[in-house]
A protein has these predicted regions:
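All-alpha amphipathic helical-bundle segments outside canonical DNA-binding/catalytic cores
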Residues: 59-71
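Active-site activation/catalytic loop segments of kinase-like enzymes and analogous catalytic loops
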Residues: 13-57, 73-92
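Active-site acidic catalytic loop and adjacent metal/ATP-binding pocket
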Residues: 1-14
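Intrinsically disordered, low-complexity coil segments
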Residues: 55-62, 134-137
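General structural signal for secondary-structure boundaries
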Residues: 40, 60-61, 119
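Transmembrane helix-bundle signature of multi-pass membrane transporters/permeases
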Residues: 8, 70-74
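ATP/Mg2+ or Mg2+-diphosphate-binding catalytic cores
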Residues: 77-137
């Protein structure tokens, strides 16, 4: 299975933001318990450390500046897409049950809140990683 969003040209921010969004919520995207939704900063650090060890050589200072913002934006954007689809009768995203897209939206909104609560730490993390030399320079 290939997600065609990953093979077309686009902003690197969307790719890393979506990667972190999908990986750093231990409860997963389909959880029914919103209280279980969280943002795993340690996993985020591991992902960004690995990513920047390679990509740090071609990302600009502005690219790095906006990484935390995209990590916060992508779950909000996806939540809005799920909510819109729910309101339009579930015509875009495949659903297993009534209210499925609404639940997905709520999970993404809760994840956005969790990222927001740790946003200063996320900015500090990116700033710290930015100072580390990239082995690929």
């Amino acid at each position: 299975l290939i997600d065609l969003d990953t093979v077309k040209p686009g902003l690197v921010h969307y790719d890393i933001g979506d990667c972190v969004r999908s990986c750093c919520n231990p409860a997963g995207e389909e959880t029914l318990c919103l209280d279980d939704v969280s943002f795993d900063m340690e996993l985020c650090e591991a992902i960004l450390t690995g990513y920047l060890s390679v990509a740090g050589g071609f990302l600009s200072d502005w690219d790095l500046h906006y990484l935390p913002h995209c990590i916060r934006l992508i779950p909000l954007e996806l939540g809005l897409r799920f909510l819109t689809d729910h309101l339009e009768g579930d015509v875009y995203f495949r659903c297993d049950r009534p209210g499925h897209n609404l639940q997905r939206a709520l999970v993404q909104f809760r994840l956005t809140e969790a990222v927001e609560q740790q946003f200063n730490a996320l900015e500090q993390l990116v700033a710290r990683l930015k100072q580390q030399p990239s082995p690929n320079l």
